[in-house]
């Protein structure tokens, strides 16, 4: 197993190329100093590609840190994107540009040489040509056009090109592809990744997008007196997806070039020039309205025409841009509407949750409501609710770090439970007439909460964090790909857990949406899914749940087989609730561990059902009211009498309200078939009364 | 007080420029990573200029260390020499060149910018022009000749030029002089500094010098079929002193250019081309013999003619090369014969002696004899003999570090004693009829050993270390400039202390030569000088001198005034010596503290006198024989009965044999007059019997 190292993999072009690399079967390691990008990009790439991407926050000038990455992963080739890239800024802070771009490249090349990694694809730029109109017959620009950058940014690019050529000249075993980009535009069609410039965008389309979404007043067109059909300058705009694919083509070219090294430049452009007005009109069409603009004076250093001659790449790399400016505008607008402020989410933050890991796969993701009263922290490990707080009061049981959750005596604190929640007698799962033996983890008698390696033990991808100011809510979407055969369950299942942290004015609430489907590529036609969350709540701000008043919507629950706690198939009436379906929890009783049912189980996806209050709990000491609402037909109410986390938590430290399906029993069971969707929605609401 | 920071100040051109800077009244700080140079260069510059030069061993890529220097010294301008400079090597290790040269320059410029230092003189190279013969009419090469280097070394130089131009373009308050050197040759006429290439020299004259001195067999002439008068290529050779002066001219130009910034390139060349054979012949003439050579094939990348057009520097900088190729050859040969192996002395090493100082002014300099038996360590502080060892046995009293020597109770251990050794009654010094009051430091009654701030407390410059394989000796020359008025003594006196560590076959010896003169610029006609060394010897490898047999050449000593231990003017006979002038030293006696006289005091410079054995000491336990030889007319023999260094040394831990003049008394005193030289020579020899 070998890896492609992508520097600047969290940047605009880098991120799109990482997606293409993964789609083409390459393993990728990303390093990025994140000065101009966000780790959220990596998270989104992981969700998009359903793959974990090893990531290291490293500045390329840090030789030793970079070397460490080469020691950890067998690197086969480097795609070197990392660079500062704003032309205007480069004239103001040239030394930052030289230090970051040239210094970084030198350091990278040294580490590569020291580790005997000699394949590199370098992100150069059409800027190296400078004003190609200074020559006769150099539009469209071929690779042999003499270079002559007119700003420090372009100088850094040509300098790095020269360094790479000198490295190759000395050691002909290097394989170096120098890719000169023209004007990349557009975004990933998924709307998950795209360009996210900090500050005022320098480029036409990102600026236009901000005008369209209402962040900028109007577009300034720098000169309409050029010698083009409409007076505005001509550029070669290339969809970032096409550009990303150009890197795959270049990389494959290097790998297929087996006999000796090479060092060669390729233009990546479409070969077709478009004027500013043409692009402006295409984007207005994508948005569906005419956007405001103003023609102002020419900008220093702008020239009439910078169109690529891409023939060398077309023929040698067998690569050609496929997408149109209209495609790019559509994708950009999709990205912009879905992420009006790019990756920036103010009320979201994360820290590493697995402090012993070199990677960031397991993080603790925290979102606070807009009113600042309610805060929830979710770990990637088990998509677990690690902490929920109302006005600073902790509402649930949990540990501070991953180690706690790995304890043998951890009673599923806060975890997502799946693939099938609760117990399956003898692990005998019957789906559409076929018996499956699923993992037994209770004295080889029952399968509990998905078995030994249930969802509570898995590392979820994500979260994709989005915020909706109008609804005063922020969502964190986690994804798990649960492969066929794991713990005996059939079929590849994609499970999404979408947490919504919502401001309710007087308090806050946490919505949990589950969605699961059998993946197309899965070899199975049906499977079983039943999901819930196993949080232990304690609203008394004290060690015990004692004093909590509880009121349930129903006093009917499934009858348990006393041998293994699985349902007998009968529904019985609780004897521990009063006539109002209420109870006051004492130090030792009443003891609840029953699956209460509120309605018939008749749907695979309950999300369109009424969202009903199924339980309320209050505590006189803290005056916190805790309401559980769900679309689900049942909920397990458990007073935590079996909790025994040595030295930390004892019995009745917290209670569970696990909105869910009926506990598995063939008579109630609804399978998940190919093409169907499993879904549910539950809210835990916390307010002071 | 402001400073010029010189990067690469220990290198060939840098070191010569530092000398010129100091000669022109500038204060200099040097940083150098010493990868291709030696700290000895700095020591020699200090001796040459009689100034301490703050030096920091820093790699320019170490931003924080460099920043620290800017915080410590108010830097006015930077002369940036530091670079790797071998064209051939640069094609083999291009990344080292980019990292060191380009990376280093970027880091330096960033630190300058951060510290608001915006004056720079940059060492560029004629190499940036590449092959100027590719154009019509570009020989001699003017500054407007298009650049186009043909190797990574030249690429690094043009890249740094571009970076500097970009920095200036953004901030017009910078003043940047870009100096393009042609072919520097020659050495400082003092023979103290010169070019010292490691490995095989790349350049014509250093190679030739090594042929002349016998380190290389013959010169290879790369092609004699060029279109020149003798068929060899033409270059513009410039004496390194002229080149150094060009930097002073450029610096002054920057400082005089007051109204705004500037960034400009200047060629530093003579304007006259010389062929390889012309230079070869000039050097043969300097050496006085025909040197062997062989014509071989042309070298890749060599071109016919690289001669400067230096008119811009001539007119704008008002600088013009003055010295000829013959001057350069003479100076190079002088440097080569005086330093056949450059700065490389294998049996010499140094460590910092003042561990708390940021500078290296006070070092501990250690030389070992060729036979490895005898080793001496001298500190710059007091040019003090800190340690002498025979076969690992310590022979003297001393401390491990500077702190010990600064103790109040340090009885002048190992120190150089001056300006006048021993006691002057009432500090009343009579020189040619004039009374001088010199520093009283013994209960305001006598001046002892030069006063409170005697030579033992001064930091000496040097050592200049040279080795003579034939004589099996290595010399360390220290210099002190003792200014008029210090401790009341009249006149600026230059004092040299030259230690020679010599292999005697069965053991080793330490020669001490003293030389002093009144400096020309001194306002005085005469002064007093009397120098000695105050080592305490102990050859018994035990805490006390007990058991040492001592035999003196004379039993006559000066009579002491019991009131203040100054001489009465009478010479008396010792009562503590036997008929052989011998004594065996016991735990408490005999007690000696007398100035024994061996001959009349009749000369200011005794160095041409007979070198006589004046004392021998042996110890039966170690079987070490210690012989003192001197040209001096007297010696103080002291059994150390006053030693009391709390917790470290007690009385009779060591004895002194201070070869010297008679203790000061007007009737014996010989003044040092202008134009005269004070001198003496003493040897301490240690051998096993």
Curated annotation (Swiss-Prot), chains A, B:
Coiled coil: none annotated. GO terms for molecular function: aldose 1-epimerase activity; carbohydrate binding; UDP-glucose 4-epimerase activity. The keyword Isomerase applies. Keywords: Carbohydrate metabolism, Galactose metabolism, Isomerase, Multifunctional enzyme, NAD. Induction: By xylose. Residues 346-689 are annotated as: Mutarotase. Its EC number is 5.1.3.2, 5.1.3.3. Residues 1-345 are annotated as: Galactowaldenase. It comes from the Eukaryota. Pfam families: Aldose_epim, GDP_Man_Dehyd. NAD(+) binds at residues 3-34. Its cofactor is NAD(+). GO terms for cellular component: cytosol. GO terms for biological process: galactose metabolic process. Mutarotase converts alpha-aldose to the beta-anomer. It is active on D-glucose, L-arabinose, D-xylose, D-galactose, maltose and lactose. NCBIfam families: galE, PRK10675.1. This is Bifunctional protein GAL10. The lineage of its organism: Eukaryota, Fungi, Dikarya, Ascomycota, Saccharomycotina.
């Amino acid at each position: 197993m070998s890896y492609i190292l992508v520097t600047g993999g969290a940047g605009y072009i880098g991120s799109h190329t990482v997606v293409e690399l993964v789609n083409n079967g390459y393993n990728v390691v990303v390093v990025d100093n994140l000065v101009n990008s966000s780790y959220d990009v990596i998270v989104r790439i992981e969700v998009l590609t359903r793959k974990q991407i090893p990531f290291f926050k490293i500045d390329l000038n840090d030789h030793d840190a970079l070397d460490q990455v080469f020691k950890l992963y067998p690197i086969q080739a480097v795609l070197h994107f990392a660079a500062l890239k704003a032309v205007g800024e480069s004239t103001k802070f040239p030394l930052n540009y030289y230090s970051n771009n040239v210094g970084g490249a030198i350091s990278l090349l040294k580490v590569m040489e020291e580790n005997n990694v000699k394949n590199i694809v370098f992100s150069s730029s059409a800027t190296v040509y400078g004003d190609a109109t200074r020559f006769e017959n150099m539009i469209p620009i071929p690779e042999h056009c003499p270079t002559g950058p007119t700003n420090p940014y372009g100088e850094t690019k040509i300098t790095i090109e020269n360094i790479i050529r000198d490295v190759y000249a000395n050691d002909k075993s290097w394989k170096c592809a120098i890719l000169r980009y023209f004007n990349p535009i557009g975004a990933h069609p998924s709307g998950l990744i795209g360009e996210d410039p900090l500050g005022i965008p320098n480029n036409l389309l990102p600026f236009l997008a901000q005008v369209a979404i209402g962040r900028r007043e109007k577009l300034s067109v720098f000169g309409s007196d050029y010698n083009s059909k409409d007076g505005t300058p001509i550029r070669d705009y290339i969809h970032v997806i096409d550009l990303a694919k150009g890197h795959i083509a270049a990389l494959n070219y290097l790998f297929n070039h087996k006999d000796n090294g090479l060092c060669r430049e390729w233009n990546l452009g479409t070969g077709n020039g478009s004027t500013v007005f043409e692009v402006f009109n295409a984007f207005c069409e994508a948005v569906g309205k005419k956007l405001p603009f103003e023609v102002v004076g020419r900008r220093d250093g702008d020239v009439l025409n910078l169109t690529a001659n891409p023939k060398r790449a077309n023929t040698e790399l067998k690569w050609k841009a496929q997408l149109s400016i209209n495609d790019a505008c559509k994708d950009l607008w999709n990205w912009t509407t879905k992420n009006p402020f790019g990756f920036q989410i103010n009320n979201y933050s994360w820290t590493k949750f697995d402090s012993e890991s070199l990677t960031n796969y397991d993080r603790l993701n925290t979102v606070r409501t807009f009113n600042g009263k309610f805060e929830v922290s979710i770990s990637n490990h088990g998509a677990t609710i690690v902490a929920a707080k109302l006005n600073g009061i902790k509402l649930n049981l949990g540990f501070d770090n991953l180690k706690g959750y790995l304890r043998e005596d951890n009673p599923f604190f806060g975890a997502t439970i799946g693939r099938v929640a609760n117990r399956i007698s003898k692990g005998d799962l019957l789906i559409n007439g076929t018996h499956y033996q699923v993992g037994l983890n209770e004295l080889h008698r029952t399968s509990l909460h998905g078995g030994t390696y249930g969802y509570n033990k898995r590392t979820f991808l994500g979260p994709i964090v989005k915020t909706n100011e109008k609804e005063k809510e922020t969502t964190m979407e986690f994804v798990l790909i649960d492969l066929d055969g794991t713990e005996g369950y059939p079929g590849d299942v994609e499970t999404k857990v979408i947490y919504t942290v919502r401001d309710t004015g007087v308090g806050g609430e946490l919505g949990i949406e589950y969605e699961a489907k059998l993946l197309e590529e899965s070899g199975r036609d049906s499977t079983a899914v039943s999901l819930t969350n196993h949080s232990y709540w304690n609203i008394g701000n004290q060690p015990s749940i004692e004093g909590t008043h509880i009121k349930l919507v129903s006093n009917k629950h499934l009858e348990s087989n006393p041998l293994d706690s699985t349902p007998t198939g009968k529904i019985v009436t609780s004897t521990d609730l009063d006539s109002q379906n209420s109870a006051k929890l004492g130090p030792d009783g009443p003891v609840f561990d029953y699956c209460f049912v509120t309605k018939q189980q008749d749907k695979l996806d309950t999300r369109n059902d009424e969202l009903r209050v199924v339980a309320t709990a209050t505590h006189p000491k803290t005056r916190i009211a805790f309401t559980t609402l769900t679309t689900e037909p049942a909920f397990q109410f458990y007073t935590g009498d079996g909790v025994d986390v040595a030295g930390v938590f004892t019995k009745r430290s917290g209670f569970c309200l696990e909105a869910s399906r009926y506990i598995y029993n063939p008579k109630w069971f609804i399978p998940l078939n190919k093409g169907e969707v499993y879904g549910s929605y539950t809210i835990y609401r916390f307010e002071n009364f």
